[in-house]
């Protein structure tokens, strides 16, 4: 997800953590104190299975677009939260907060506040980075991870995005390249050209549902620009050299990689992450893009449900 008023979905776009609360997690909405501020959360469902906590993408694209995953709440609590600086979580005027380490501590604070002793993680786009980094220091009680449209190697991400840019009509591609060269990415022409890219590789469902529109409208620009950069194709922020591949071999919990057939997280790149992860599964969803749950909820949600059930069984869960 990238910068832009229309918003962007790039390294880029969410993570979900599912967990089991000490005294049970009841449906509720509230705010949680985290390092640097407060974050909004909503827990839905009251099923008996291990809860699911969702880590959205961006960085800075709030959790609205993950709404289809609420359908899993008939079996387990599902927890949505907007990371600090976007959506319903107020943005402090301090860009020094936008670091991987602080977001890991934020996730730890959310999990502690909600009493999630056992959890399944679901991360999408940037959320997969957050999930992976969280596992380095807080692996206890994490029972599985869904890596949705992962952005685990940012140099590869840029190469893949550039290859997709060259599939656009020349008239569209040249507008994008000219605006990025001149640093005029707020221009209406650039926004219109990028929307063509989004409709192909971010979300193919037309028209965009209200929740997806809200996610883009309420993007945290400071978070996105500081960590990512100006666009889907130019990563100049603090994530620019991120590569988490070396840690994938250390993962010992069940892992499912997902992506859309037309995802900006290219299926061949996602497959390389799956191959580097012991025992990992992978599923590609036909005719879907980066926001796979929005593009094909009828197929996607049952696939996530089935994976979580398998993970529960492996961990001796219900």
Q: What do the predicted segments below correspond to?
A:
Residues 37-91:
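Conserved HGGG/HGGXW glycine-rich cap/lid loop of the alpha/beta-hydrolase fold
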Residues 155-219:
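Helix-rich cap/lid subdomain of alpha/beta-hydrolase
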Residues 251, 257-259:
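Short beta-strand/loop motif that positions the catalytic acidic residue
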Residues 83-126:
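Active-site loop/oxyanion-hole signature of alpha/beta-hydrolase fold enzymes
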Residues 279-318:
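Catalytic active-site module of serine/aspartate enzymes centered on a nucleophile-bearing elbow/loop
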Residues 117-163:
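Conserved hydrolase catalytic core segment
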Residues 213-244:
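Hydrophobic, aromatic-rich cap/lid helix
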Residues 264-269:
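Conserved alpha/beta-hydrolase "acid-adjacent" motif
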